Amino acid sequence: MRMIVGLSGASGIVYGIRLLAALRELDVESDLIMTDLAAKMVEIETDYRVSDVCALATRVHDCFDFTSPLASGGFRNTGMVVIPCSMKTIAGIACGFADNLLLRAADCTLKERRHLVLVPRETPLNTIHLQNMLALAGAGATILPAAPGFYHRPAEITDLVDHIVGKVLDIFDIEHHLYHQIGRAHV
């Protein structure tokens, strides 16, 4: 299994960091694309260094390297997650405006009919945001808002983050124990 992980410049960068860590723990290869603003969010929202985040990925790709294999629809992978996904990124993908590698990889993921999961954290949403997400859902993307559930009785922020990351892994049928799934015994 090989997954593309895009980190865009939305608040909630901890979701992307946790996904990279979970993929590493689960022996899933990850190809990371991080925008400049995402790197800034790492500094603003966490105690991580950007190099620490990059070290969680199997491979790191420059966001403006259009010679990367990720810029081709022929690049074999399981799918792509953009987590967190800014409204700018959603708009770019929805309009087919691929001016960086993250947007181009998302475009390739859609056109090749692979799983594309977008995790927006923005709130509130305006009509333009909703229309862009509706267009992407119609094109085959999964919109998974960073809106954690509470049925698993979270005790810490990490429980809330793990719930969303677990939902992403569920879409790709990746077994995990990040949250208690209703109907399954807690392991």
Regions found by a protein language model. Give the residues of each.
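A cross-family phosphate/adenosyl-ligand binding-site feature
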Residues: 1-117, 123-184
